[in-house]
């Protein structure tokens, strides 16, 4: 059960991660069901990501699928299609080719993307993990547009992995709650995913990188600092580095009261403490940190504290401050050039240049 969309006089409209009779979530799929005393009716018939709104007898079903770009909006009355809302959105120039799967013993939802021109005889590829990996952020979706940026990175010569480990939605309540007091478990799942997928896909485990933004930025920095045996380069965008500095309503939900246990839970899950780097491994790996100086969500102090701690520990790193940019990068020119800078950093760091 993902959400309650509408309550009718004699039925409910709900959003779910699996259809009737399914024993576990269908990887990347979100469906719309009509439920009444007679049973359930699945309004979304094709695999994909579906949502709906309803007013009286009319339902508008909005669908995204892997095979076509954008969204398709259908108008239904009494379960029958009466109209399709025309879309005038531009068609993307990239055609993603993700393989959706479940990785490892934990059955971690994952998507794998290879370069468009890749052939089986081309050999193993440098790896780029591209997770969000935290609460409220599902990245593995059966939707075309979800993989435009990952496919672009793949076309630069990488095998790209998007994995939704513990803490992400769409799996089960227990899956989401498994990270209580232990955000670092999300890193364990990325490690499990890449090792398991290497048994099925052409991955060069001697050249593994990771990039992410927000929670994904935290995860990317955590990866190169705590597991340099697995990750050889990382790009951390707008990372939370000290959980004491982030929103109370979010952080205390998962990590509890920072005053308890002498702050040990917060220190263990943060990248930096007042004493410097937190539980960093001895081996150094290249790390680029990117942060918008106008970010009012994850404030730039997070990156400044991490950079200061890295410098104090004698660890080389790169910091890219983005003047006038908030938590995301909606400016087209900035976003485009930022992608190019990231590819350049990854290729230099992995010896691909």
State where each predicted segment sits.
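Structural motif
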Residues: 22-33, 67-75
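Residue-level signal for WD-repeat beta-propeller blades
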Residues: 6, 26, 53-54, 104
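Serine-hydrolase catalytic core recognition
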Residues: 54-353
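Ampipathic, surface-exposed secondary-structure segments
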Residues: 16, 28, 34-37, 43-49, ...
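Multi-bladed beta-propeller domains
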Residues: 1-8, 17-21, 35-50, 78-102
């Amino acid at each position: 059960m993902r959400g309650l969309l509408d309550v009718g006089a004699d039925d409910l409209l709900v959003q779910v991660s699996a259809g009737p009779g399914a024993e576990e979530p269908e990887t990347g799929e979100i469906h719309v069901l009509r439920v009444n005393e007679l049973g359930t009716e699945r309004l979304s018939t094709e695999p994909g990501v579906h949502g709906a709104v309803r007013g009286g007898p009319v339902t508008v079903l909005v669908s995204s699928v892997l095979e076509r770009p954008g969204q398709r909006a259908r108008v239904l009355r009494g379960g029958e299609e009466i109209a399709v809302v025309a879309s005038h959105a531009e068609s993307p120039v990239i055609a993603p080719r993700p393989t959706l799967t479940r990785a490892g013993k934990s059955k971690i939802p994952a998507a794998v993307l290879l370069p468009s021109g890749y052939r089986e005889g081309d050999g193993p590829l440098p790896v780029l993990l591209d997770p969000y990996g935290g609460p409220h952020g599902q990245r593995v979706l059966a939707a075309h547009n979800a993989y435009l940026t990952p496919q672009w990175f793949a076309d630069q010569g990488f095998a790209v992995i998007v994995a939704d480990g513990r803490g992400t939605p769409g799996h089960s309540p227990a899956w989401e709650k498994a990270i209580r007091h232990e955000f670092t478990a999300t890193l364990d799942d990325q490690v499990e995913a890449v090792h398991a997928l290497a048994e099925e896909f052409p991955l060069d485990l001697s050249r593994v990188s990771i990039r992410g933004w927000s929670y994904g930025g935290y995860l990317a920095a955590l990866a190169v600092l705590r597991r340099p045996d697995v990750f050889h380069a990382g790009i951390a965008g707008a990372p939370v580095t000290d959980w004491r500095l982030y929103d109370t309503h979010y952080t205390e939900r998962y990590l509890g009261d920072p005053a308890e246990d002498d702050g040990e839970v917060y220190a263990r899950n943060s990248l930096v403490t007042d004493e410097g780097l937190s539980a960093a491994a001895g081996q150094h790996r290249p790390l680029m940190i990117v942060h918008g100086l106008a970010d009012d969500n994850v404030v730039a102090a997070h990156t400044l504290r991490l950079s200061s701690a890295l410098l104090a520990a004698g660890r080389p790193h790169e910091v890219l401050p983005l003047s006038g940019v908030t938590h995301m990068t909606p400016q087209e020119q900035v976003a485009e050039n930022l992608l190019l800078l990231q590819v350049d950093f990854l290729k230099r760091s992995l010896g691909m240049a």
